[in-house]
Amino acid sequence: SELKFGDNDCLASLLVNLTGADLFINLTSASGVLAADPQKNPQAPILDHIDDVAALDLGQLCGGKTSVGTGGMYSKLLAARRAAQIGVPTLILPGREPHVITRAFAACGVCAAPQGHQPFTGGTWVCPARHAIPRRKFWLAYQSDPAGSVHVDAGAAKALLHKGGSLLP
C-alpha cells in the first residue's frame, strides 16, 4: 500500500533511516510532548525529555489517534519511536516559534542564537534506544506492509530466530 497524504511523520521517520540522519527534528503546532492527555489534564506540563519512548503508552498519553487517524502528537511519537529504534534521537519542537531550530541548537551550545532572540529551551528531546537495531532490519520492518508467507525448514527457522541470520547468500 502507498503512503497517503497525512502520513508525513511516518514518512519522515523512514527518511531518517534512508538518509542515515543523526538527528530527527519534527516540528509541530504544540509546544512539545505533554506529560498527560491534554483532554483529561489541561495543566499537564511539557516533558523536556523522554528516556524510553518504546515504554510509553501512547494511547494513554495522547488519547489515542487524532480524529482522522493521522497527524497529532500520537503520530509524532510513533515516528520518534521508529527513529529511536535505529539509535537516532528526536527533537519535537513548536514549528511556529521564530528561528526555533537555531535557537534549540543555541540552547545546546551548538551555535549562537539568532540576533534578537534568546536560546529556545522548550520542546521535547526523545532519546535513542539503548540497543539500536541495524538500519537494514528497520528497513525490512517498516518499508512496506508484509504480504505473503515463506516456509522454511527447522534449521533455517533457528538461524533466523535465534542467530539473527539471513537466508540470502
Q: PLM features: residue spans?
A:
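C-terminal catalytic "cap/lid" subdomain
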Residues: 1-169
